[in-house]
């Protein structure tokens, strides 16, 4: 099948993404027809589905390369696969913690913003002070506890 057909079979992966995956080495270069069209077989589709699922789980390109190498290696050690997964879980947990901290901070700031026609706003002050490299003054000015 050609690249357009492959992208339809593997939903969520555009023709452009398939070319990109080929360029960065996630998938092997496709065979070409006499008129230089890419041709994909069942193994290529299976690999694209593997890449898409790994991407859906949030793995980085480098992690996907590692997982593909392990997937292709029939003598692999499952401990290596588990190590990649555990590293990714730890990374996701760090991101979740950072997002939770941002959410808490924004909720706190939003609760102290009057949301009326006054120009004073702890949200803007917090962002402006952080952009200036200053310690946020929103806490002192608006009587907020430390964030």
Curated annotation (Swiss-Prot):
A biological process from GO: positive regulation of DNA-templated transcription
Alphabetical list of PROSITE patterns matching this protein: HTH_MERR_2 (PS50937)
UniProt-recorded name of the protein: Heavy metal-dependent transcription regulator 1
Pfam families listed in its UniProt record: MerR, MerR-DNA-bind
Organism of origin: Rhizobium meliloti (strain 1021) (Ensifer meliloti)
Keywords tagged on the record: Copper, Cytoplasm, DNA-binding, Plasmid, Transcription, Transcription regulation
Gene encoding the protein: hmrR1
NCBIfam families per record: CueR (TIGR02044)
DNA bind region: 3-22
Disulfide partners: none
GO cellular component assignments: cytoplasm
């Amino acid at each position: 099948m050609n690249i357009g057909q492959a992208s339809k079979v593997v939903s969520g992966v555009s023709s452009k993404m398939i070319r990109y995956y080929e360029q960065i080495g996630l998938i092997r270069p496709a065979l070409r027809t006499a008129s230089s069209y890419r041709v994909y077989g069942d193994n290529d589709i299976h690999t694209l589905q593997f890449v898409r699922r790994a991407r859906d789980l949030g793995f980085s390109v480098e992690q996907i390369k590692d997982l593909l190498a392990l997937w292709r290696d029939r003598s692999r050690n499952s401990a290596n696969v588990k190590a990649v997964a555990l590293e990714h879980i730890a990374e996701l947990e760090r991101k979740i913690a950072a997002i939770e901290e941002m959410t808490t901070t924004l909720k706190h700031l939003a609760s102290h913003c009057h949301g009326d026609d006054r120009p004073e706003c702890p949200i803007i002050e917090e962002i402006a002070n952080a952009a200036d490299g200053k310690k946020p003054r929103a806490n002192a000015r608006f009587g907020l506890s430390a964030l």
